[in-house]
Amino acid sequence: ASFAALYMCEGSAHPLQMMHADAINDLWTNTGERGERCMVVDVAGEGQDRTVVSVWDGLHLENLYVEAKSRGPELVAIIDSMAKMEKVGRSRIVVDCDGIGGMGVADYLKGCVRFHGGGKVMTQEGDEAANFQNLRTQCYYLLAELVNSRAISINPDLSEHRVDISLELEAIRRKDDMAEGKLKIAPKEEIKEMIG
């Protein structure tokens, strides 16, 4: 089912899947709006064997670095080197701080932006209170909206990561549970289990 959904554009494999299979497939041919460059760092944590650093030019994924699990200071030096090479300032580096590894890296990368997925939902002036469980959920809903509307693109030179990226995006599911009146997504552990 995954091959047909991802590569043959035969619709979503699961009713709670947030991103349509054809929209995921189109990421490689879309033309995402260019803008400010930034880096997003997902540090290897418990059970993970790699750190992933993505480099964005607006809504276009320009580059992707996958690093073997490294110790804090060594990883910070690698990220600093990448930032210089990619011309990304510290204030444009976002570090996922949900795990211990991310917190340590962010401590060394003075001036970076710390992302706390369990944190408070973002609101803009004039918006009604958002009904998301947390910031992580809000970001996944926004990502799904951007992917499904074909607003995001991925550099075709990154095709070696195509299967991994596609499987990860396909695994993001909304929860069919509005008991607290909040939109929710499947927990990280459940998503990781689906990916395998």
How would you describe each model-predicted region?
Residues 57-182:
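Mg2+-dependent endonuclease catalytic cores in nucleic-acid-processing enzymes, primarily RNase H-like
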Residues 188-196:
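Acidic, Mg2+-coordinating catalytic module of metal-dependent nucleases/exonucleases
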Residues 1-41, 55, 175-184:
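ATPase catalytic-site recognition across NTP-hydrolyzing enzymes
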Residues 34, 45-52:
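Short, flexible loop/turn motifs enriched in small residues
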Residues 29-31, 51, 105:
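Hydrophobic alpha-helical membrane-insertion segments
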Residues 2, 48, 134-138:
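Charged, alpha-helix-enriched surfaces in structured cytosolic catalytic cores
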